[in-house]
Design a protein with these regions (language model features):
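Non-catalytic structural scaffold of enzyme domains
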Residues: 1-249
Length: 249
């Protein structure tokens, strides 16, 4: 197969399925051959990311990701994409394993926020406890001179319920709970824009988009970027040249 990209997924599987569905439905097609070429590694056995980030005595998820990246690197994909925000805890270590361009979903999303909402000084952040605990998005926002609003103590339990109880355990999206979280971040904490810092939250946005709030959806953004890059490379652009605009430092 020529000109394909590799997806490091399975964190969780339903969220990865959402990413794949987005790229398949958004690419303009007239025939089978117009779809994108990609290999999906749906490694559902990767240990819980938040558990390790908060407690290093828990299984380290780096080694599973390392094995997946090295295995795919042997096939020489045009670029890597990893649709899991919290897994970017090990982004630098994973990207260093290969010369293949490795997109940084969180960084790309933050730059999209700056581009789309240049006058906003802060953005509401809802994410896994792992991402919050290690300041993954907070640090990326600081790089571009923006602030993250995390809300009060009532926010994280609602986010955890939506991510873990509803989506990861039951495979459902509670529309009302998702909208309540967004409304609380907007009305109580003054967030004109809210960043969906977990791909399960991106799934919630896909399934329950009927609300009036501005969101930055990293999975939706990386899906569009994946399509853009894959088509440029298919049309003859060098992969490193194509990805250069998104390889933010």
């Amino acid at each position: 197969m020529k000109h394909f990209f590799s997806i490091i997924g399975g964190m969780g599987t339903i969220a990865t399925e959402s990413y794949v569905r987005l790229i398949n439905h958004r690419v303009k097609i007239n025939k089978d051959q117009d779809y994108l070429n990609y290999i999906l590694v749906n490694d559902a056995q990767i240990p819980d990311r938040t558990a390790y980030i908060k407690d290093h005595s828990k299984p380290n998820f780096f080694y599973d990701l390392k094995e997946d990246v090295l295995g795919q690197a042997k096939l020489n994909p045009d670029f890597f994409v990893m649709p899991c925000n919290t897994a970017h805890y090990f982004y630098d270590d994973l990207a260093a394993l290969t010369d293949v361009p490795f997109l940084h979903m969180m960084r790309i999303a933050v730059h999209k926020f700056v581009e789309d909402f240049p006058k906003e000084e802060k953005i509401g952040l809802i994410a896994t406890e792992g991402s919050i605990y290690d300041h993954l998005y907070v640090d990326e926002l600081k790089r571009v001179g923006k602030k993250a609003e995390l809300g009060g103590s009532e926010i994280q339990p609602m986010v955890n319920e939506l991510i873990y109880t509803d989506i990861k355990e039951k495979g459902i999206v509670d529309h009302d709970l998702y909208h309540k979280i967004l409304q609380t971040m907007h009305d109580k904490y003054g967030c004109n824009v809210i960043l969906l810092g977990c791909t399960e939250l991106s799934l919630a946005q896909e399934k329950a988009p009927d609300h009036p709030y501005n969101v930055i959806d990293p999975q939706s953004i990386i899906a569009d970027v994946s399509i853009e890059l894959a088509l440029k490379i298919r049309n003859g652009m060098d992969p490193k040249e194509a990805t250069k605009k998104y390889m933010y430092k």
